[in-house]
Design a protein with these regions (language model features):
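Conserved class I S-adenosyl-L-methionine
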Residues: 1-36, 38-47
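Class I SAM-dependent methyltransferase SAM/SAH-binding core
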Residues: 48-90
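A short acidic, Gly/Pro-enriched loop at the edge of an enzyme's catalytic core
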Residues: 89-100
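A short glycine-rich, Lys/Arg-flanked "PGG" loop and its adjoining helix->strand segment in the class I
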Residues: 115-127
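A short SAM/SAH-binding and catalytic strip from SAM-dependent methyltransferases
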Residues: 99-113
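Conserved beta-strand signature within the Rossmann-like core of class I S-adenosyl-L-methionine
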Residues: 128-133
Length: 133
């Protein structure tokens, strides 16, 4: 995972430039249709902050995390919220979120760690919570 984080730290600007304006609202809305207005969402591996900002603009409570220090800086600036630097393996919340949005993020996990992280994600969800990955 360190190589992945190093890559994103070094190429964050190029990644943001190529993805921030991608039209993604149809997929985002499909996720949101299962949530109550104002629900709490974790943007798990938020990258540029594009989706965090979209969800906040739609009235949802959003917490955003990323393992890349550069993405944390960029996303915090773009969204106006305090994005936390955190590895997927460090998720320890219990029944905190109504939805977890893990768009193009947990695919970077080694297979050996995926089951553990999916279990942590399930534990972090409230009853009837949903995940997008």
């Amino acid at each position: 995972m360190d190589d992945t984080l190093q890559y994103y730290d070094q190429h964050a600007k190029a990644y943001v430039d190529s993805t921030r304006d991608v039209e993604f609202s149809q997929t985002q809305e499909r996720f949101l249709q299962y949530l109550e207005p104002g629900a709490r969402i974790l943007d798990f591996g938020c990258g540029s902050g594009r989706d965090t900002k979209y969800f906040r603009n739609r009235g949802f409570q959003v917490e955003a995390v990323d393992g890349s220090a550069e993405f944390v800086r960029i996303a915090s600036e773009y969204t106006g919220i305090n994005v936390r630097r955190m590895l997927f393996q460090d998720l320890d919340e219990v029944e905190r979120y109504d939805g977890i949005w893990a768009c193009s993020s947990i695919l970077h996990l080694p297979c050996a760690e995926l089951e553990v992280v999916l279990g942590k994600m399930a534990r972090a969800l409230r009853r009837r919570g949903i995940v997008y990955t």
